[in-house]
């Protein structure tokens, strides 16, 4: 990773890093895009995505980090199976694994809701008409 950063600085280029290792991503990324089933579901600065995640899939990824285990014997896992992309589901592809899913999640893909000028998330929980829920990461899931 140090070599990639050195090359990036020397050449003044950007690097796209695709990884499930959020620890590595946190150390090297300025901006983070979280993808699920081939679609970006949350995007923002690394600080925004790590310290104020808004999409339930991002919550699950963050909760699966060892730092959130707090002495537990096992890490958090997101329940269910990813959808088959041969016949993608109608609506939000994460809905069947999302314990916070709303009825509309099974009918319509959410748009990207603006949280800040640089932070967006595709979740109906950010719609002003959605019920207010407490994020498992702390704080409310609302705009």
Regions found by a protein language model. Name each.
Residues 45-143:
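Short catalytic/signature loops enriched in Gly
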């Amino acid at each position: 990773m140090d070599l990639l950063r050195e090359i990036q600085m020397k050449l003044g280029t950007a690097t796209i890093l695709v990884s499930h290792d959020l620890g590595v991503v946190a150390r090297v990324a300025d901006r983070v895009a979280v993808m699920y089933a081939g679609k970006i579901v949350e995007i923002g600065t690394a600080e925004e995505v790590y310290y104020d995640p808004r999409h339930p899939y991002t919550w699950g990824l963050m909760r699966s980090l060892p730092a959130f285990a707090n002495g537990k014997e096992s890490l958090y896992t997101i329940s269910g199976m990813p959808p088959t992309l041969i016949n993608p589901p109608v609506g939000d592809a994460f809905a069947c694994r999302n314990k916070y899913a709303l009825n509309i999640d099974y009918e319509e893909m959410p748009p990207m809701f603006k949280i800040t000028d640089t932070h967006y998330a595709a979740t109906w929980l950010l719609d002003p008409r959605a019920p207010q829920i407490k994020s498992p990461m702390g704080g409310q899931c609302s705009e």
